[in-house]
């Protein structure tokens, strides 16, 4: 673990790391059999990029160097990810509409790296600064937990990665037992709170008018449908996906809904 903070962070290493990360991310994003799996999470969510950022800044000797090199890493890697995908995507350069988030994140690395650099102090300020990243990783771990539960084993690697990365940061960047104990507490609390806040809505109810209703569902594997005696319909998550639910009353009234299951939650949209 000590080797993690003992590297010489040259400009050559920053640029090569940015290019390698971009190529790997783009390739994983382009392969269709990785859809909705941990292997594409690197292209969507920030946890892997937190690792890259921390690796760069803790191996810099000054806060100014940390800020500039972290900024340049993201300035190269993020647009390159989309540029590599352009020739293989129907959207072409339209893919860059998704770069807006990462452009904002890239700009924020300048002040962010200055603050994060304080983790090298090895004191309670280090614990406070690191706790922000640990709390975020705990939040992401909870999010992936519900995704795994909804479509096991998809995202299981991402769940394990977030927990292990948080623990790695604790033992690689903090030295005192009291600091580590507090940091581990932050991880556990953030996971527990996030599990409660992010708990999916496994079932939704559609209220109908009186009378007898029948239904058809385009893809029954996505959601389970139950007609209740109180003139309502219960929709329960089965697996990730989208399907069309059509309800018809005995008088001929017709109602249509898009049913989306994502992260274990059920979302219902009315079709006018």
Task: Annotate the PLM regions.
Residues 1-74, 78:
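N-terminal topogenic module of multi-pass integral membrane proteins
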Residues 37-48, 97-104, 154-160:
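Structural signature of hydrophobic alpha-helical transmembrane segments
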Residues 49-57, 104-117, 161-169:
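Hydrophobic cores of alpha-helical transmembrane segments in multi-pass inner/ER membrane proteins
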Residues 79-151:
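Membrane-proximal helix-loop-helix units in multi-pass membrane proteins
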């Amino acid at each position: 673990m000590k080797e993690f903070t003992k590297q010489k962070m040259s400009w050559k290493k920053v640029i090569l790391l940015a290019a390698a990360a971009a190529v790997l991310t783009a390739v994983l994003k382009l392969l269709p059999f990785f859809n909705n799996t941990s292997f594409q999470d690197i292209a969507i969510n920030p946890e892997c990029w937190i690792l890259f950022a921390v690796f760069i800044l803790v191996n810099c000797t000054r806060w100014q160097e940390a800020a500039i090199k972290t900024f340049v890493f993201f300035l190269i890697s993020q647009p390159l990810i989309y540029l590599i995908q352009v020739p293989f995507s129907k959207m072409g350069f339209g893919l860059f509409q998704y770069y807006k988030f990462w452009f904002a994140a890239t700009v924020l690395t300048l002040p962010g790296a200055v603050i994060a650099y304080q983790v090298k102090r090895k004191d309670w300020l280090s614990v406070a600064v690191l706790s922000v990243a640990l709390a975020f990783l705990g939040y992401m771990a909870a999010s992936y937990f519900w995704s795994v539960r909804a479509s096991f084993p998809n995202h299981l690697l991402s769940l394990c990665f977030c927990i292990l990365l948080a623990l790695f940061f604790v033992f690689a960047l903090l030295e005192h037992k009291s600091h580590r104990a507090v940091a581990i507490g932050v991880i556990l609390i953030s996971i527990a709170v996030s599990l409660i806040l992010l708990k999916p809505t496994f079932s939704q109810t559609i209220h109908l008018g009186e009378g007898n209703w029948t239904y058809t569902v385009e893809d029954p594997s996505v959601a389970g449908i139950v007609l209740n005696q109180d003139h309502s319909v219960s929709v329960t998550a089965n697996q990730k996906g989208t399907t069309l639910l059509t309800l018809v009353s005995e008088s001929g009234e017709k109602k249509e809904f898009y049913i989306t299951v994502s992260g274990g939650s059920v979302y219902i949209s009315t079709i006018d």
